[in-house]
Amino acid sequence: MRTLWIMAVLLVGVEGSLLEFGRMIKEETGKNPLFSYISYGCYCGWGGQGQPKDATDRCCFVHDCCYGKLWSCSPKTDIYFYYRKNGAIVCARGTWCEKQICECDKAAAICFRENLGTYKAEYESYGKSRCTEKSLKC
């Protein structure tokens, strides 16, 4: 339990919007994002390289690309606000950047939900060093 707490504290320091993104993932998939997505495949978690291993990993690749388009924003530190209306995620309030970061996270969380059927436990904690193929471009 202590290790989990330390890991959570470190991750919060890495990405300010991580708590919101994690909550979105949990709400959309029912999975614990810390265990299920933090180091899934070649693109989920910090950084990415090689070829996405499956549809879930491709969600992370697209999410990385989405963040990459926000070059004038700080997607790793900006905190945003969202709520649900009739079950749908609504990105609300805040700056233009915060809303765009929220939209990137929303798209990824929905993508994870839509690809739950192809999620493979073998790609959890998949070492990025195993992702040696030529990397995709956004």
UniProtKB/Swiss-Prot annotation:
Its main location: secreted. Monomer. InterPro entries: PLipase_A2, PLipase_A2_Asp_AS, PLipase_A2_dom, PLipase_A2_dom_sf, PLipase_A2_His_AS. Residues 1-16 form the signal peptide. The active site is at 63, 105. This is Basic phospholipase A2 Tpu-G6D49. Expressed by the venom gland. Ca(2+) binds at residues 43, 45, 47, 64.
